[in-house]
Amino acid sequence: MGRDLGWCFFVATVLLAAVLLPAPTIAGRLELKNEISGVASVRKAKLAVRCWSNEDDLGWNMLKPKQSRIWKFTTMNMWPFQKTEFRCQFRSGFGTTNEDVVTVFSVKDGFRKQCGVGGDECFWVAKRDGFYLRRIVKDGGGDSRKKYVDVLKSKWVWKW
């Protein structure tokens, strides 16, 4: 009898944990887009980007105006292993971001909520006046287009 009760308690605990705990892994998506416009020189409108995670160095990429770079990955989202984080450096003809290194994706809840609805996708946009987080405020639903607002995170600054 005691053994059956212990077994039932164990099964109930496992089921409760499976329901209440977040999924240990999720599909993440990071997109960087160059929307620098109104510049006579294409060279000045290019965006140099170097990104890396805890495990991978994604190297330098050069984005011309209207180009984007997308990375898809699997995140680890189970305490105490919440570790998936991507950081980038940005250089444009207008300077660099205030911070030399910008965290552009993290599985930490506070960060993911900044990205908007769902929190598993983060969109960043370079414009002539600075660097923006494109926050999703409505996930299209029946309409296939997402609604978003661009939140200025850093004006371009000269550090050289």
Curated annotation (Swiss-Prot):
Subcellular location(s) per record: Secreted
Pfam families in UniProt: Self-incomp_S1 (PF05938)
Chief subcellular location: secreted
InterPro entries: Self-incomp_S1
UniProt entry tagged with the keyword Repressor: no
Protein family (similarity comment): Belongs to the plant self-incompatibility (S1) protein family.
Record protein name field: S-protein homolog 13
Name of the gene encoding the protein in the UniProt record: SPH13
